[in-house]
Amino acid sequence: MGQKIHPTGFRLAVSRNWASRWYANNNNFAAMLQEDIGVREYLKKKLKNASVGRVVIERPAKNARITIYSSRPGVVIGKKGEDIELLKSELQRRMGVPVHVNIEEIRKPETDAQLIADSITQQLERRIMFRRAMKRAMQNAMRLGAQGIKIMSAGRLNGIEIARTEWYREGRVPLHTLRADIDYATSEAKTTYGIIGVKVWVYKGDTLGRNDAPVVEEVAEEKRPRRNARPGGDRRPRRDGEGGGPAGARRGAPRRAGGAGDGGKTGE
């Protein structure tokens, strides 16, 4: 069922990391998760024109650190940093703890799955033909280094009466391979005919390391000595008389045939 599973969830802790990186007990987990969802929805509406790819939320020691990945960081920061300060104050009011906001630039927006999906949905809302928007996005992604891309649109495409699904693929998109770096995202276009859903898979090559996965420190196991090992090394060779047998006896040697009265001599 590799075609059905979420590509990011399938690779969590292997080559991908979580978007919310914090721990909570059973009493606070639901409230903190709902808070994260509200923050992401607010940032999606507030920074609609800033080309935001993803948002990472961390909560270290009664604080919050939010990292916004955008291809247009100047729009997020604003003139002389005014917009970022207003954004920070609003996030502090919503979360109730001090918030630190970091902005990271996306160098290649043409190969980012979320930005590709958002771009296609914006074109669909402007009544651009869906095939033209999909093929243009695929050409740009392949031109800038993507090894494969797949785009799927579903809904009342071009305003037809019966909804259908169409998808196009260029290159290869190995969804079963865990080491494959697959970027996956979805978006929705709200048209006059209804909602059109867009899904994007981008294959960026194989990851030799852990990529964005959480780092787990491996504890080196100490080499335990053997139970019967001697400090001097291997055991010395056994001499005659050791091991519980009589002196001169050898394991597996034939017994003498003579009795005690003949002086130990054999029959002559």
Swiss-Prot record:
PROSITE patterns associated with the record: KH_TYPE_2 (PS50823), RIBOSOMAL_S3 (PS00548)
Bias (Basic and acidic residues) ranges: 232-242
Biased amino acid composition, Low complexity: 248-257
Residues annotated as domain KH type-2: 39-107
SMART domains to which the protein is assigned, alphabetical: KH (SM00322)
Record keywords, A-Z: Ribonucleoprotein, Ribosomal protein, RNA-binding, rRNA-binding
Region (Disordered): 216-268
InterPro entries: KH_dom, KH_dom-like_a/b, KH_dom_type_2, KH_sf_prok-type, Ribosomal_S3_C_sf, Ribosomal_uS3_bac-typ, Ribosomal_uS3_C, Ribosomal_uS3_CS
SUPFAM superfamilies for this protein: Prokaryotic type KH domain (KH-domain type II), Ribosomal protein S3 C-terminal domain
Any GO MF annotation of the entry: structural constituent of ribosome
GO cellular component, one term: cytosolic small ribosomal subunit
One Pfam family from the record: KH_2
Gene Ontology BP terms: translation
Comp. bias intervals (Gly residues): 258-268
Function: Binds the lower part of the 30S subunit head. Binds mRNA in the 70S ribosome, positioning it for translation.
Subunit annotation: Part of the 30S ribosomal subunit. Forms a tight complex with proteins S10 and S14.
Database matches in PANTHER family: 30S/40S RIBOSOMAL PROTEIN S3 (PTHR11760), SMALL RIBOSOMAL SUBUNIT PROTEIN US3C (PTHR11760:SF19)
Family assignment from sequence similarity: Belongs to the universal ribosomal protein uS3 family.
Annotated protein name in UniProt: Small ribosomal subunit protein uS3
Species annotation: Paraburkholderia xenovorans (strain LB400)
Primary gene name: rpsC
